[in-house]
Amino acid sequence: MQRATRASILGSIAIAAALALPTGSAMAAGQGPGYTCTGGDFATNTFTTIPSATYASITVTGACNIALNAVINVTGNINVAPGGVLDAQSAPSTITVGHNVIAGSGSLLGLGCQPANWIGMFAGVPCAAEPTGHTTITVNGNVSATNANTVLLRMVTVHGNVSLSGGGGDIPWSIKGDTIDRNLTISNITADWLGAQFNKIAGNAVLTNITATDPGDPGRTVAVVENTVARNLICFGLEPGVSGGFIPGEVNHVGHQALGQCAALV
């Protein structure tokens, strides 16, 4: 019941985020000093919408989403400030980031939506605003989050590293279907649930000190499912345990070594 209720709440949030008209205030400067997105209220499903444009940078301090079918080019960084919300996972869009995506303490970073059958065995998450649509998101640098409340990365191309350290909350963390040209590092997170699934990682994948707290299902574990890792897959301190998936054959494919709790998941 708790899981169903949470799913319903998250669905409502996603739909509201996708369909909300711009509210609050936002400052755009095209290719000038950048764009600061303010306003919105995540608690009431009110969002400021970021429109199509080329920006020097984007800074998110409020609750912000992406316009339906927007084409956004950011020559520098996207910064989600502490407590900010960036919902780029509810409406189809094309987003290209020249440098890095950085999420601060207590923030929510959501990137990517697609038809269910685009990732693994129906592991994709459809765009709430247009279920048959999809996002195309490319980050030419790194994606990093420090003490974030929630991080959702689905079918994102990252030409650098993905580094997630600390934080967590009542929303499941999902790192799935991504292409990561360097390393994936996830550490010191206590969240409802966390899954690293169906990713292609050119370097190492290191998951340490992660706790899944889902109160509705005591059997819930950290999921490490069908990733292709060119170098090493390393897992330590995953509580209450680690799962390799429910379908036979959903093992991870590792070029060098699988160590720790993930040694048996290859």
Kindly label every feature range from the protein language model.
Residues M1-A29:
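Secretory targeting and sorting signals
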Residues S12-P22, N142-A145, F246-V251, G255:
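Hydrophobic alpha-helical membrane segments, chiefly transmembrane helices and signal peptide h-regions
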Residues P33-S52, A63-I72, G83-T96, S107-T138, ...:
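Extracellular beta-strand-rich, repetitive "passenger/adhesive" scaffolds
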Residues V74, I78-V80, V97, V101, ...:
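Fold-core signature of tandem repeat domains
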Residues S163, T185, V206, T211, ...:
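General marker for long, soluble alpha-helical cores
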